[in-house]
Amino acid sequence: MLRLTRSVKNLSLGAVRFQSTQAPRQPKNMFVREAERAERDAQEAQKWRGGKKHLNFGVDMSISETPRGAAENVRVAPATALQYTGRGAHEQTMEVVNRVRRQYEFLPRNREGVSPPNFVTRITYLTMLGSSEPVSGPQHTELTKALADLYYIDNQLKPQVVKDLLRRFSRKIDTDAESGEIETLDEQGRAVTRGRRKTSSARVIVTKAPEGTVGEVRVNGLLLSQYFKELQHRSEVLFPLSVVQSEGKYNVFATVLGGGNSGKAGAISLGIARGIIVHNPLLRKRLSKAGCLTRDARTKERKKPGLRRARAAPTWVKR
């Protein structure tokens, strides 16, 4: 037993005596190995091509002309790194908008007396991008908020670059479609327009009142106060005139058919607003902002089976 122990001890000492003095070899990093492999492939390709220039990865090279090792390293790189975000088209657009914002962030903003901006909708913005990437609501809101910051720059100081950018994303509203066909004054200086509301239809003639006289409003041959007994209906008819502060400056003759007093008043009001624009097209923006040029498309909701009216239900009892 003693002899075996001494022999084992001598073996261990001998192993220590003949051990190498060099440090143990550390495993290489994965990125280092890949870099060395790419360098070897490039050297092989250079030798194979007869000492010509290095492989140009920006040129479209067919695999048949490149060694197998070098062909595996050829990758089609995207035009911008934003492509890796999954929404590259939107991020690239935001990068352009934010760059313009940073460039002109020192310019003063003016919100007083400026109409609110009207930018493209999310569906239109998706069409403008022309890509298969979806555009969510928060992404569209991000764009409109950035554009609104540029929109409120003082018009006297607004650069042409900002104007072109806003014009690209502005929604084009056809205001003539809201007011029907473009009307003109006839030989007698009258504006003949039409208006509709619910089941009522009105034909309205608007003329300027002679100087020194107060214009009047007649409905089916009767004065406005005689035809509409309620103040609410009379106020609705005269609302377009009050918006442009032209009470008493025009004579209005309306012929209205169908519906009740509420529908008739709405139809006449729309016809008056359209007639005012024929006389003075510069008032279109003010009337449109007040909602006078948009037809009210609401109608009475139909009665439902089992209900007393459209939505009113009878009292429920358990038994």
From Swiss-Prot:
One of its GO terms (cellular component) is mitochondrial small ribosomal subunit. One of its GO terms (molecular function) is RNA binding. Keywords: Mitochondrion, Ribonucleoprotein, Ribosomal protein, Transit peptide. Transmembrane segments: none annotated. Residues 296-319 are annotated as: Disordered. It is found in: Mitochondrion. InterPro entries: Ribosomal_Su5_D2-typ_SF, Ribosomal_uS9, Ribosomal_uS9_bac/plastid, Ribosomal_uS9_CS, Ribsml_uS5_D2-typ_fold_subgr. It holds the Pfam family Ribosomal_S9. Residues 300-319 have a biased composition (Basic residues). GO terms for biological process: translation. Belongs to the universal ribosomal protein uS9 family. This is Small ribosomal subunit protein uS9m. The gene is MRPS9.
